[in-house]
């Protein structure tokens, strides 16, 4: 998943609204499919954005594909991100890691046996 803008150190509201609906209504169909979030920011907010987006994957039993660093690239104007050598290297490593996981055959056929979900609250 890739976002264009980070607002106040987080993903924009339109993206969050869309992802809330998709993962609420279809999250069970995404289980065991690998996911990776990428944040593109001018300067700050990438790590908070990255964290928020990864929560959609982790609550849906999706393996999260990682890289050598947090999946972010920095730039404000078109073309500026192309100057972020470290960010671009992080994206290349992420792509290789994703390809390896996909080639390994992650999918419903190889999914672990699911347990019946137990719902508890913080206070019993």
Residues covered by each model-derived region:
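Glycine-rich phosphate/pyrophosphate-binding loop and the adjoining helix
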Residues: 63-124
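Helix-loop-strand module that forms the ligand-binding subsite of alpha/beta enzymes
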Residues: 4-69
């Amino acid at each position: 998943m890739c976002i264009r803008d980070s607002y106040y150190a987080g993903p924009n509201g339109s993206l969050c609204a869309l992802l809330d609906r998709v993962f609420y209504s279809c999250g069970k169909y995404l289980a065991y499919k690998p996911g990776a979030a990428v944040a593109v920011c001018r300067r700050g907010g990438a790590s908070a954005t990255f964290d928020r987006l990864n929560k959609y994957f982790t609550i849906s039993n999706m393996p999260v594909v990682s890289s050598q660093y947090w999946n972010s690239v920095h730039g404000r104007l078109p073309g500026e991100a192309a100057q972020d050598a470290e960010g671009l290297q992080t994206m290349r490593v992420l792509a290789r890691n994703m390809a390896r996981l996909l080639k390994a055959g992650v999918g419903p056929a190889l999914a672990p046996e699911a347990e019946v979900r137990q719902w508890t609250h913080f206070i019993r």
